[in-house]
Amino acid sequence: DFLVPARLSPGSFYALPQSPQLFKQILMVAGLDRYYQIVRCFRDEDLRADRQQEFTQLDVEMSFVDEEDVLSLVEQMFVDVWADVLGAEVKAPFVRLPYAEAMTRYGSDKPDTRYGMELADLSEAFRRTNFRAFSTALDNGGVIKGFAAPGAASWSRQELDGLVVEAQGRGASGLVWLAFAGDDIRSPVRKHLSDEEVAAIRQASGAGDGDLALLVADQEGRANTVLDGLRRLMAERLELIPTDRWNFLWITEPPLFEWSEEEGKWVSVHHPFTSPATEDVALETATARAYDIVLNGWELGGGSIRIHRPDVQRKVFEALGVAADEAEEKFGFLLTAFRYGVPPHGGIAIGLDRTAMVLAGAENIREVIPFPKTQSGTDLLTGAPAAVDEAQLRDLGIQLRGSTRHQP
């Protein structure tokens, strides 16, 4: 959160809204069955090519709807926008891809499906391998996954070593490659692999003559992250990406919870007000009635059907380790409203800046935002964030600890 000190309440702070999530749910309880707003949001997070700390979204919430109502509404909006702005024909309904399938096939929950190179899981083919790097990964609960890059078998050793460095930069301990050129198989690990294992790689990855197989042996999450990055990189270098294709798709049925290494606990994948697919809220297996809209590898928005039953909301809080008194302190107004009856409701938020970026063909969201922040979160026009006058700090009842002032 970005915190704003309250002058009239010394020691207290406002938080700039990351999202109007709770407010729009309260509106549903109050009987406003349709809510639409273009809203400014603020999130104190690291900046990326598709992310700024201050952004604008089209926010939608509706009562007495299910997933199909929300998805069809948004699909028609994008069909109309693409026709009006680009003169491009986009057909609905969009492809629906379950989260688990997206991770299996692409290693990403926002895949670019304009080109192939889908991932293959070769773990079973190497259960009895003598190749230590693979056997160690499997013994540690990892996986062996990879894909075939068409026509890349002729790459030089220097280029292939560069791919290894790319994989390591994304967190992999290494990268195994095999270049197939007829009966000639070029690879630094060829002598460690049996003919049956090489054949399994060709079959699973779909590698043909002239293709390059790239394999990663690691924990599944890291393997997916590395291979997703390599897949996108190879598509660019091999010029496999059609520039006139708009592959909209929905990612559905994501996990309800995920383990946070940083926080050392289970957290909500979306937010704790997302409805579980069933009343079972088991931490490791529960899925959510949530959906993200993805276009050509960019996530344009996301939403969910919300929890509308107080007992289910309490179960989710308990699963997340939120004590009853803490839930009451933070979300008491929502829980109180729930006691009066809540209509089934759901919604979505569409990132307008990110959508404008894609429509404009820009590679960075800064290109479509006036006065964007730099990678370090600085406004180059005004120099913000900047030091604050001591008198103003006194008026706000704030004393800085140590030399924590920001030097512009």
What kind of region is each of these model predictions?
Residues D1-P408:
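Class II aminoacyl-tRNA synthetase catalytic cores and aaRS-like
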